[in-house]
């Protein structure tokens, strides 16, 4: 009996792993996961809370988008900026994934249609601002089947973070109202104090913290000193000529300086 049980668990694990990779390929076009992604996804599919610290462009979104596709119900994603929501939703829809963003930039008819789609279970991911989530918690969320909560830019919840948003502090009510729904908090910037504050304020239950490497081998920092004002412009021009077919950004100390350099 013990051997049979182990074999069943092994088969279930392999089947889930196969399903995850098939979903990754068919919806997102990738053949393999980036470091930590697969582990985070398994953790979330097991209905466990987590805090994910990954650099920008490190693949945070797939950590909750893929579990949303493999779970019953709708994933609710809290995002602070309408522009970020729109970008995510457009990308998901282009990949054939039912997603929408409930926010103040929509007209009321569009928001009403989104609410209906959520209640009827036709959306896999709903993006929403913290302010809108608070307003909808006793109405829309109550009538939805929710697979998971993803709190993007989670450092906004902490006064120790660099981008504190008071509305984020009310996200702690999610576990109180929906104790069975797992929460994944994601950020690209949080020191130890901020991470502890995120976990405390969101009331995460025995969360696992995943910290990805922030090493960017394709990025280097080179400081050149000793230029006079006129020499700086000449040095910039020479640098641009050496990298004529490449992309780049020139940062200046003021708007006037930006116009002069341009």
PLM feature spans:
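Helicase motor core with emphasis on the C-terminal RecA-like subdomain
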Residues: 19-27, 31-35, 39-51, 55-61, ...
């Amino acid at each position: 009996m013990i051997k049979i049980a182990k074999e069943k668990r092994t088969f279930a694990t392999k089947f889930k792993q196969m399903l995850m990779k098939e979903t990754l390929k068919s919806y997102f076009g990738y053949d393999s996961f980036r470091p930590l992604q697969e582990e985070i996804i398994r953790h979330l599919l097991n209905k466990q809370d987590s805090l994910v610290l990954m650099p920008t462009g490190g693949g945070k979104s797939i950590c909750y988008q893929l579990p949303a596709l493999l779970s019953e119900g709708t994933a609710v994603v809290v995002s602070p900026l309408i522009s970020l929501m729109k970008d995510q939703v457009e990308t998901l829809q282009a990949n054939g994934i039912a997603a929408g963003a409930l926010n103040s930039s929509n007209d009321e008819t569009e928001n009403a249609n989104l609410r209906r789609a959520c209640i009827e279970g036709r959306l896999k991911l709903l993006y929403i601002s913290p302010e809108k989530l608070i307003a909808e918690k006793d109405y829309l969320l109550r009538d939805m089947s929710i697979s998971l909560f993803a709190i993007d830019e989670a450092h906004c919840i902490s006064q120790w973070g660099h981008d504190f948003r008071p509305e984020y502090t009310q996200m702690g009510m999610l576990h109180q109202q929906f104790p069975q729904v797992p929460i994944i908090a994601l950020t690209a910037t949080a020191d130890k104090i901020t991470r502890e504050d995120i976990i405390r304020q969101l009331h995460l239950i025995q969360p696992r913290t995943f910290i990805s490497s922030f090493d960017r081998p394709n990025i280097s920092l080179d400081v050149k000193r000793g230029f006079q004002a006129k020499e700086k412009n000449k040095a910039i021009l020479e640098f641009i000529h050496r990298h004529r077919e490449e992309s780049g950004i020139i940062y200046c100390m003021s708007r006037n300086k930006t116009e002069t350099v341009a």
